[in-house]
Amino acid sequence: HSGITVDEAGYIYIAGGTESSDFPVTKGAYDTSFNGARSWGGDVFVTKLNPTGTEIVFSTFIGGEVQETIGSGGIKVDSEGNIIIVGITASHDFPLTQGVIDNNDNMHAFLSKLSPDGQKLLFSTFFGSSSREGIAGLTIDDKDNIYISGATLTAGLPVTDNAFRKKIIIPKSGNLKDHFIAKINARDHKISYLSYFATDGYSSSFIQWTKPNRLIVCGSPTAEGFPVTDNAISKKGKGKLDCFVSVFNSETMTLEYASLFGGSDEDRVLSANFINKDTIVIGG
């Protein structure tokens, strides 16, 4: 998996996994030594290019002694130029910072923040409880709050009092998981919202913040028990696996819209965004 984003000045940021110990890194970068195994992603890398893509501004490894990889679309840049990445690691020595959300080395999902110059790890944490979690979606708002979405097999996530749903819906099959949504404060990196949401489904999910205070969350649940709203396109699933699209108010984290849609077999939604205040475009 990999991710790419562009900041307001046109600089290009790329994150991914590498098995190459000679992957190009720059002097003074956070980590210039390859740490991982040469399989399943090796180490994560974060690289910043100039706007024309002709020069490396900085490039660094991030990882432990086993292996890790970045989540799809798992890189964003906040208003201060800090670089946020999410992914999965199997390394017990993956670099963490003080005041982390979770330091349990059984956890495989991670969330990390690099300084604008790529030289300092400002924040890094595992995310989860007692079983494997996967972070599949990452977005930030205009106040630099971080939103993540993903999937879990565990009932032990630290849900908040204002959660939409506080209990997991146990998957009926070993390859299915329950979706979760979390909001993390920009300054103290504490969880301000965490909820189970979309019933059991595959782990892929997409999340996108847009003005004014709208949070789109999409994925592919099984239809049973999905919390559709009265204005949904479809309130019942039609196939083995359906798409869902939902909209939250990002300030209150209240659900404003949720719908299922799809055909008679398996369907997956991979991206979505508003093109005006009332219209969402989706792709999958």
Where are these regions (language model features)?
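A sequence-level/structural motif corresponding to short, flexible coil/turn segments enriched
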Residues: 1-284
